[in-house]
Amino acid sequence: MIIVTGATGRLGRQTVDRLLDRVPAHRVGVSVRDQRKAEPLRARGVRVREGCFTDSESLAHAFEGATQVLIVSVDQFGEEAVQQHRTAIEAAVKAGARRVVYTSHMAASPASRFQACRDHAATEEILRSCGAPYTALRNGFYAASALQFLGPALDSGQVALPEDGPVSWTAHADLAEAAAAILADEGRYDGPTPPLTATRSLTFGDLATLAAGITGRPFTRTAVPDDVYRRHLAEAGVPADRVEGLMGVFTAARAGEFAAQDPTLAALIGRAPVDLAASLREQLA
């Protein structure tokens, strides 16, 4: 049985949908924190069990009978994130999974300027020593994050953010389809995958130009000093660790950490990945 964690989240839910295009429902199980949100999956024949990355006993039940486990990384920074990933990896191995698959990041590195990428690197190190075959999906930066950063500008026309660099913004839907393809073809990749990215890298200046072309309204890209951006986030009530995490996106982008483009994603899904311009057009429609 293939177990998918976080199956009511954006990436996990879409991965299950695409996986059901490839394998029978009785071969798919999900581990979720709230079973009620997964009732539509249960109705389709998917096994639904409660599992939490902070509760190894719940994971033992959720992962029972697993041949593969897809561990969708948590939306946290730092040691807490790494510890939760460790708990999930150890539970998957203990359950007898033949392979552990993990949603990592294209820029995973202990030297990254972005905390989440350092966390992914630490998790990959745990995977390397876990005693089971593993695959680390080196996912491109989620396109949804670009749209969130751009959100306030859609009304004001002012893209006021710290200086950035080119990023291979990549759609959840494409990454979910790739994950499903890899799970259905067990062992296709061993260890870290090549970067799973869109076909072009864009800056927020590029996004401002795209938004202007789509809407016919002017959009101005203004570089906000880092300390000013930090202060704005703090004044908005963003926790200090989150402030530094968000700032890390820009400092890492300036260093070119997210600029890589690779054909692997297109090969996996059998078509060109969704371009961020299409996502932006949908957002502005």
Regions found by a protein language model. Name each.
Residues 37-44, 61:
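Short loop/helix-cap segments at secondary-structure boundaries that form the rim of catalytic
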